């Protein structure tokens, strides 16, 4: 699993990019906007980019 108990990332560079349930760590890709996230990020419920949430 890319992100442990919280599900996979959006993108190919999982592993060190993601915390188990919190916001993604840096180094894999940016958040480009509320609903447009870079590799290894997903859109969270409040418009930020988080690990383990589905895209909006």
Swiss-Prot record:
**Keyword Aminoacyl-tRNA synthetase appears in the UniProt entry:** no
Tissue-specific expression: Testis.
InterPro entries, per this entry? Mst87F (IPR055083)
Q: What is this protein called?
A: Male-specific sperm protein Mst87F
Is this entry keyworded Oxidoreductase? no
Q: Annotated Gene Ontology MF terms? A: structural molecule activity
Its Gene Ontology cellular component terms are:
sperm flagellum
């Amino acid at each position: 699993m890319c992100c442990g108990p919280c599900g996979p990332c959006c993108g190919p560079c999982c592993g060190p990019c993601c915390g188990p349930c919190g916001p993604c760590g840096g180094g894999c890709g940016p958040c480009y906007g509320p609903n447009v996230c870079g590799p290894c990020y997903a859109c969270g419920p409040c418009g930020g980019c988080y690990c383990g949430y589905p895209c909006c």
